[in-house]
């Protein structure tokens, strides 16, 4: 197993059977990231060590945790994602950088206890907030985006 499981998240962070083209896009992002870091595919320990930096918020001075009411469904989770995107855009407008980190969701009991989350709340994600170091190779990585026609279809326009 290459991915840590922690205590086990309360939701599937990724689909259990990630299929093409999503699997391919995820793989490409991972390869680009580790190439920038100089960590070859075969260096499992190096990749695990880098992944562990998530749990130090990559050295960011500020962290944000987000939880969701357990009674909410996919529409509200979508709303929450849009709200987080707006938070990230507002941070950027103020000169701050951010990194959403769903990896925190694999420690729901530990983080939930630390945050004193009520039983009806579920840990959704964490976020690093600070200033990117543009001298570091990963802080300048821009991942490839799929063409709009591959991800959306506009009918009647």
Label each PLM-derived region with a short phrase.
Residues 1-157:
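Acidic, surface-exposed loops and disordered segments
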């Amino acid at each position: 197993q290459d991915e840590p499981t922690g205590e086990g998240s309360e939701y599937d962070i990724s689909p259990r059977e990630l299929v093409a083209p999503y699997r391919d896009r995820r793989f490409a992002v991972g390869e680009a990231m580790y190439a920038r870091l100089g960590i070859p595919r075969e260096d499992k320990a190096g990749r695990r060590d880098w992944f562990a930096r998530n749990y130090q918020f990559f050295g960011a001075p500020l962290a944000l945790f987000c939880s969701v009411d357990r009674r909410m469904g996919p529409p509200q989770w979508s709303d929450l994602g849009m709200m987080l995107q707006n938070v990230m855009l507002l941070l950027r407008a103020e000169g701050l950088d951010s990194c959403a980190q769903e990896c925190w969701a694999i420690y729901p009991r530990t983080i939930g206890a630390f945050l004193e989350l009520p039983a009806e709340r579920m840990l959704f994600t964490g976020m690093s907030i600070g200033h990117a170091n543009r001298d570091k190779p990963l802080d300048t990585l821009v991942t490839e985006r799929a063409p709009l026609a591959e991800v959306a279809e506009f009918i009647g326009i």
